[in-house]
């Protein structure tokens, strides 16, 4: 006779199972478990009197015979491909199995072998996501990296050299000298890193040398002059050397309008930053570019989501970041031209429709590096409140919406920048960059951040206490964030051309250097659950935005979840 147990008791012991629903933090978003790959009555769990003991759930096999290094038991995975309950096996820093863990000598259906060489992380009651990817980083100060890691970001792509005036405004690491120094600096940080060279040049040789020096992409920024000639030159080099191009277009429309930029791009793949326009870009209608099939549009988090405070805070941020003078009327007019209620409101809806594919931070250059994930799910919450369930969802859950929004900060930036073979999702063979969340803190405070198979960050209590949990509990770096443990658990992304040219050896880099690949063969259709291409029109007088003829508008939020309730200091 099988033993029967109530759903509540089961969830409290092994975590939720198929059909169970979970509210995410203080949002109105409801997740429902779609599948459970663990076997009822044969679940593995660690602890006194529990299953993972020698001869029971722990096998006699050696590591050489397939035993994993780490098992995360009874994890609830939220990823673009599904919402499933499973055990996760990690070996050599990569995800080696998703399914049923245990001892094949005593249990059936085991595809993750637990042995004496296996560490256990209790995933019961936790939600697991892939480490987030922030693809719009101004590397202004190194302290950003700890803040990002503490929020669940494990990969940072962008440009900069520190608090230089150019870096404060643009995500560019210009030239071989600066690229080399940043690659060497990356050795000391416990996240994956990649650096963009400056793409503003009509002389292709000036761009090629940056890619060959180790840039993983090129960035076109209006503060350096994003002219049609520069756009064409930069994309030509990118096509030749297989790196992505990111663009911040011409707010002032000095060298042309959005139609001229589209013409200069010539149908080639490009990642458009802050495509709504408040972060910069052709005023007032850069947003229409999100309907192009070759354009991968992203947002930065200062406009995520639209709130009562969004417009007011932007003006001062703009003046500081772009080295503008409030005493000069033209500078003030430039800043004001970028801040439009109508396009910011439309941006919320375009994200919900899956027309905007990525959300990133714009760190310290109008964006907040530690709020990429929280702003993403604040937007999802606001859209559910204002627009109701998506057509793909029902009254029981918001699964499709959740998968759409998690994709914006994980798999889609990975695909866009040619690194999805390594990171961006919870899939076998990828780097074990995983974030564990307690449901009550989902999106705002990770419980554990696993980096390359080792714990890099965790909520931890008083180090002098007799157990790990006494107050004050707060996020702290863990062992793999220190010393030589960083090198085998983190990747540095370079162009394949730079790796073939021996840049890692010449710079004596110890971290694994991985090439970006296939950035030029992708399109909007490559974006998971975010590939909609509506025809966008903007009224030049009122700034109203229309998608396929329908007006896109919504009210600003007066309050938000994932905010001050969790952040008292």
Curated annotation (Swiss-Prot):
GO biological process, one term: urea catabolic process
SUPFAM superfamilies: Composite domain of metallo-dependent hydrolases, Metallo-dependent hydrolases
GO cellular component, one term: cytoplasm
Keyword Hydrolase: yes
Record's keyword terms, sorted: Cytoplasm, Hydrolase, Metal-binding, Nickel
Annotated binding of Ni(2+) 2, by residue: 219, 248, 274
Textual note on the cofactor: Binds 2 nickel ions per subunit.
Reactions mediated catalytically: urea + 2 H2O + H(+) = hydrogencarbonate + 2 NH4(+)
Residues where N6-carboxylysine is found: 219
Catalytic residues as annotated in Swiss-Prot or TrEMBL: 322 (proton donor)
Record-listed Ni(2+) 1 binding positions: 136, 138, 219, 362
Enzyme class of the recorded protein, top EC level: hydrolase
PTM comment: Carboxylation allows a single lysine to coordinate two nickel ions.
Example GO molecular function: urease activity
EC code(s) of this entry: 3.5.1.5
Domain Urease: 131-569
Binding site for substrate: 221
Pfam families on file: Amidohydro_1, Urease_alpha
Pathway entry: Nitrogen metabolism; urea degradation; CO(2) and NH(3) from urea (urease route): step 1/1
Subunit structure of this chain's protein: Heterotrimer of UreA (gamma), UreB (beta) and UreC (alpha) subunits. Three heterotrimers associate to form the active enzyme.
HAMAP family registered for this protein in UniProt: Urease_alpha
Family listed: Belongs to the metallo-dependent hydrolases superfamily. Urease alpha subunit family.
Protein name: Urease subunit alpha
The species this protein was found in: Prochlorococcus marinus (strain NATL1A)
Gene symbol of the encoding locus: ureC
